[in-house]
Amino acid sequence: MRTVLVVVAVFLLGGVAMAKEKKTVQDSRIGNLSKLRREQLSAKVSEIRSYLREASVADTNAERLLSFVAELEKEVRSRKYGLIFEEHKERVDIELEENIPVLTENKKCFIDNGGEMNFLIEGDNLAALKLLEKTHRGKIDLIYIDPPYNTGNKDFIYNDSFVDKTDGYRHSKWLSFMEKRLKLAKSLMSSSGVIFISLNDIEQPNCRVLCDAILGECNFCGQIIWRKKAGGGQTDDFFVTEHEYVLVYRKTKAFEWIDDTIVADAGFNKEDDGGKFKAVKLEKWGSSAHKEDRLTMWFPIKDPAGKKMYPIAPDGLPGRWRVGQKRMQDLEKNKLIYWEKKDGRWVPYEKIYSIDGDLSKIKKVKCRSIFYDEVGGTGDATDMLTEIFGKKDIFSNAKPVSLIEELLVHAKANFILDFFAGSGTTGHAVMKLNSEDGGKRKFILVTNNENGICEKVTYERLKRVINKEKYAAKLKYFKVDYVPITEAGYWERAEELLKYIRELVELENGIDFVHDKSVAIVLTNKEAEALQKDKKRLALCKTIYKGPNVLLTPEIKTEYNIDVKTIPDYYYPELED
């Protein structure tokens, strides 16, 4: 045995000739050196395997060493491009190894103001994502996340401790943390789904390569540069940092980015040297048309008489422009503003030229990769939180609602997920946009409750804006809990998990079980018998979740076309292992 180990060591240290077919001197000096090294190592591994097979057929240790060699070969041949980082185990990983995650409801927090059902989940987002895999695999249309930026200034907590700048594994911990969550996020995305990830300079380059590996470089849609503030302090080492990034990745080619469509009542009825064009008013109309709705979009421009003018809303109050200051400057510079005098004042319009002279086509405007003032900045987010809560310092570095709205309008999204929910901006944006365009979008937010953030900030914000703005929305508050994994048999474990099934059923179907008749849960044959006698209820029912020992008549499927799922196996197939 000692001889075998010595030979293995010698081979691995380079004591054996490289490959039987040697490369020429010229070949070894040009081309892919990493590939050459892999081939050389692979050749060594092959010779080690051959020796072990011939060394001792009867030696059981040789078989064990062969399995080690297979692992080495797999590692050598695996990654050809990408990040190399140390994988780290989190405390939640151990929690999930020793326990089964479940959900419990805080019923006191239920909000019913009509509209769609939404969910707020309190707990570690890794556990929450594993639960969402059971209910929403392939169903999420849009994910927005604002993960910790890993600044080293107490923004990234790993295993209950802040990761500071002196931690030698700082970036590895962040990447290991994100990799697990992004892999789960990918499994939740629909085929036409998209994910937006807010980042700053610290981890943006690493996250880009990580997303290429997980989601595919071919699914990279672009990178938005968002101007989060104008000016600011002089504390940065070299530049005053005014921007952050939003990475955009799709799940597959089925994702469709919705360009802005410009429609004007008058049509292409005007003409200049550039051709036929529509005149689209630059003053905002419809919802959110007032100055206070977007302060950064209220600024003066000069009319043809050289006088300063400000936008006016349709009701005569101070308004806002449709575009930001930088875009307005571009329009002026490129002579794309058309002026008309109405009621004694000059009114500016954007010129939208016809496509190839075909007046039947509608102009589609591509979204610009740099967001200037159009979507607001962190100051706007801070001001909004102060207004909602009536006090300052509610949450640091929140994103403005208008930024999330801008992302939402470019995707066909019914189900929206944010598993770094923070102050709840994503939920707020979804409800606001629904109220403006009559949409039926639904959101799931996930956040931990560190310093009471989930209860005191995320939930409280959603509750307050629903009440104040009269948003048509429902909200359930769930919490991640754990059931210990024991040596108990199937029936004992099934009985325990059935106590938590209602929450998963509600989450999957987007319902409140008490008031919704489209879904039924029957855990005993007595309950099944009562349900089967209730013909009116069966006529409304679409899905029945039944316990493992419950028997239903064939008519349930044949006559009523009801889908039947056996629980807890439907959600916890691992119970059968």
Which residue stretches match the model-derived regions?
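Short glycine/proline-rich turn/loop motifs
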Residues: K107-G115, N159-T166, G379-K392
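Small/polar loops that bind or transfer phosphate-bearing groups
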Residues: I121, S198-L199, D418
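Conserved SAM-binding loop and adjacent beta-strand
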Residues: I121-G123, G390-S402
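Conserved proline-anchored active-site loop of SAM-dependent methyltransferases
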Residues: G138-F156, C211, H410, I416-M431
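Mobile active-site "lid"/loop adjacent to the S-adenosyl-L-methionine
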Residues: P148-F177, R181, S190-S192, E203
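Basic, amphipathic juxtamembrane/active-site segments
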Residues: D155-H171, M431-N449
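Conserved beta-strand signature within the Rossmann-like core of class I S-adenosyl-L-methionine
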Residues: G193-I197
